Amino acid sequence: MKRVLLLSSLCAALSFGLAVSGVAADGAALYKSCIGCHGADGSKAAMGSAKPVKGQGAEELYKKMKGYADGSYGGERKAMMTNAVKKYSDEELKALADYMSKL
């Protein structure tokens, strides 16, 4: 009986984990943490000098965020963006880039 209960619990836990990981990243929800610097509609020049995200394509935005994450992109003040994007998965960065490209 204990073995059946243990096996059932394990299966339930694995099923829950698969269901959670299968949820698509929500670019709009992720963008909420970007509004302070980039503005609600993406038209704000972050730190007074960055190109607004509004009007940029998804692929361009994705490449820039990946570059910030790995240190290959950005100017003197890239530390803030590097720290901001490092926490996101590749799927989340793509969802975020897709959302921003539609602002």
UniProtKB/Swiss-Prot annotation:
GO molecular function ontology, one term from the record: heme binding
Phosphoprotein in keyword set: no
The subcellular localization recorded is: Periplasm
Described function: Natural electron acceptor for a formate dehydrogenase.
Question: Where, by residue number, does heme c bind?
Answer: C34, C37, H38, M81
Keyword Metal-binding in the entry? The reply is yes
The coiled-coil regions, if any, are none
Its post-translational modification remark reads: Binds 1 heme c group covalently per subunit.
Q: Which UniProt key words apply to this protein?
A: Electron transport, Heme, Iron, Metal-binding, Periplasm, Signal, Transport
Query: Residues of the signal sequence?
Result: 1-24
Predominant cellular place of this UniProt entry's protein = periplasm
What is the protein named?
A: Cytochrome c-553
Gene Ontology cellular component? periplasmic space
